[in-house]
């Protein structure tokens, strides 16, 4: 990553590989105040299978209907809005120039057949990611906490 228009190559897999009870943690840094998808998306042509949309002042949800109704956390703190966190709330929480661990709990990715990061049309991330973890929602709390701490430490955070 050089911090400009970087993305992750799309990973492809069979539908059903992921479940309707998935959690995702991403160490992410926005280097500009521009709107961006800071989470994952299945395809840039499917506006519903996306999560982590950060858009200044927007009252729309930060998770598309094709990704379930997860709760959203930044640096271990749940964002206001429950399972309906807005794009504006996420945009504010992910401060520019700093790494954060962005977390989604309770994603439904059971129909996804691919995933990508950073290059979502019109919402390209100008920044970097320091790691992505995707795991079952049933993961014990102690393991989830250890994963968050490890991911944060990779990018210089103490969580």
Language-model segment annotations:
Residues 131-159:
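Extended recognition patches within non-cytosolic domains
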Residues 73-75, 118, 135-137:
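Predominantly extracellular/luminal cell-surface or secreted proteins
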Residues 1-71, 110-112, 137-148:
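Extracellular glycan-recognition modules
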Residues 12-24, 33, 90-100, 122-128:
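Extracellular/lumenal carbohydrate-interaction signature centered on repeated Trp-anchored short motifs
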Residues 11-12, 65-98:
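Short, aromatic/His-centered strand-loop micro-motif at the edge of beta-sheets
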Residues 107-130, 138-139:
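Extracellular glycan-interaction patches encoded by glycine-rich segments
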């Amino acid at each position: 990553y050089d911090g400009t228009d970087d993305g992750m190559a799309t990973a492809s897999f069979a539908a059903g590989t992921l479940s309707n009870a998935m959690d995702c943690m991403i160490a992410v840094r926005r280097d500009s105040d521009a709107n961006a998808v800071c989470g994952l998306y299945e395809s840039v042509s499917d506006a519903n299978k996306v999560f982590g949309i950060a858009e200044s002042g927007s009252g729309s949800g930060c998770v598309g209907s094709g990704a379930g109704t997860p709760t959203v956390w930044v640096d271990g703190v749940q964002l206001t809005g429950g399972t309906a966190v807005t794009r504006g709330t996420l945009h504010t929480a992910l401060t520019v120039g700093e790494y954060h661990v962005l977390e989604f709990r309770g994603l439904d990715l059971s129909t996804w057949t691919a995933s990508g990061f950073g290059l979502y049309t019109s919402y390209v991330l100008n920044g970097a990611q320091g790691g992505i973890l995707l795991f079952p929602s049933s993961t014990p709390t102690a393991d989830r906490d250890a994963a968050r701490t490890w991911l944060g430490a990779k990018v210089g955070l103490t969580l």
